[in-house]
Curated annotation (Swiss-Prot):
<dbReference type="Pfam" id="PF24551">
    <property type="entry name" value="SH3_Rv0428c"/>
</dbReference>
<keyword id="KW-0808">Transferase</keyword>
<keyword id="KW-0012">Acyltransferase</keyword>
<dbReference type="GO" id="GO:0016746">
    <property type="term" value="F:acyltransferase activity"/>
</dbReference>
<protein>
    <recommendedName>
        <fullName>Probable histone acetyltransferase Rv0428c</fullName>
        <ecNumber>2.3.1.48</ecNumber>
    </recommendedName>
</protein>
<dbReference type="InterPro" id="IPR056934">
    <property type="entry name" value="SH3_Rv0428c"/>
</dbReference>
<dbReference type="InterPro" id="IPR056935">
    <property type="entry name" value="Rv0428c-like_C"/>
</dbReference>
<dbReference type="Pfam" id="PF24553">
    <property type="entry name" value="Rv0428c_C"/>
</dbReference>
<comment type="function">
    <text>Shows histone acetyl transferase (HAT) activity with recombinant eukaryotic H3 histone expressed in bacteria as substrate and acetyl-CoA as donor. May be involved in survival under stress conditions.</text>
</comment>
């Protein structure tokens, strides 16, 4: 009996072809999307290969190729366009975003250009201070050299997977603007002018039977990849967040993104519930991001 790895893992699966086929066996190489009731493997071309689990004769787990720094920078460009805040500006390779202090991703400076350097942090701090906002830096892996330990740090994982179109669950409602039900379930104060901005992209606000909500944004990366990013996940309870409600909601939003040309999906996670849901849907680690207060000790000597 085959012992299946987690969904999203790169695999080679050898399976039997229909009786009389020559050769009698063939291989599917790609990302494992499902194992029951049908095995589904997505190849690097995007083709999905399907076959019965009883026809599987061998399985090999493949190592993921190392993520290039350029790929991290490209994804972060797309993610920044998905949460640009209500005010933004470029400063020496940094994108500075402000939005009433709500949602850290839209109230932080991120070093997107290769020219970004820590010697700009004093000016970044002044920009946020002039708006009565805490100056936060969002620093993805390898985009900027940092001191090893800085005070007030918060870490996020950025997880990714391939996406494809599909029929959404009829229990999922998708809107291009958050309604009262969506805002009520979100629980926190999220001004509309914070929730709805996107740079050269499209938004969807999804809800599942009034027990779970999430936001999706389709934006483009400089390398040409079109991404759909999931965020603002809230649910009535943890079971709704990690169970069928969360899965159906996310799948519907990913399918919506694929229908608008997205080929890859991402989500930023910093809590267990979101991580469990993401991994159950085949998301895998791409890189980390660190949020740091700009006044952290060590910037002036680094």
């Amino acid at each position: 009996m085959v012992s299946w790895p987690g969904l999203g893992t790169r695999v080679t699966v050898r399976y039997r072809r229909p009786a009389g086929s020559m050769p009698p066996l063939t291989d599917a190489v790609g990302r494992l999307l499902a194992v029951d009731p049908t095995v589904r493997v997505q190849t690097k071309t995007g083709t999905i290969v399907e076959f019965s689990p009883v026809d599987v004769v061998a399985l090999r787990v493949l190592t993921d190729a190392p993520v290039r720094t350029a790929a991290i920078r490209a994804l972060e460009h797309a993610a920044a366009a998905a949460w640009p805040g209500v005010e933004r500006t470029w400063l020496d390779g940094w994108l500075l975003r402000a939005g009433h202090g709500a949602v850290l991703a839209a109230n932080s400076a991120v070093p997107l250009d290769i020219s970004a350097h820590t010697n700009t942090i004093t000016e970044i701090s002044a920009w946020y201070a002039s708006r009565d906002l805490q100056p936060w830096l969002a620093v993805p892996d390898r985009l900027l050299p940092l001191p090893a330990d800085l005070a007030g740090e918060r870490r996020e994982q950025v997880l990714v997977r391939d996406v494809s179109t599909g029929e959404p669950d009829r229990s999922v409602t998708l809107l291009d603007h958050p309604d009262d039900t969506w805002l009520r379930l979100y629980h926190q104060r999220l001004p509309l002018d914070m929730a709805t901005p996107v740079i050269d992209g499209e938004l969807a606000f999804g809800s599942y039977l009034g027990v779970a909500v999430a936001r999706a944004a389709v934006t483009d990366a400089p390398d040409g990849t079109r991404w759909v990013g999931l965020s603002a996940m809230r649910a009535a309870d943890e079971q709704s967040a990690t169970g069928s409600a969360g899965r159906q909601l996310w799948e519907a939003l990913l399918g919506w993104g694929a229908g608008r040309g997205a080929t890859r999906g991402y989500v930023r996670v910093h809590d267990t519930a979101t991580s469990v849901l993401a991994e159950s849907l085949g998301f895998r680690l791409h890189h980390h991001c660190r949020y740091l207060p700009a006044q952290s000790v060590g910037w002036d000597t680094f």
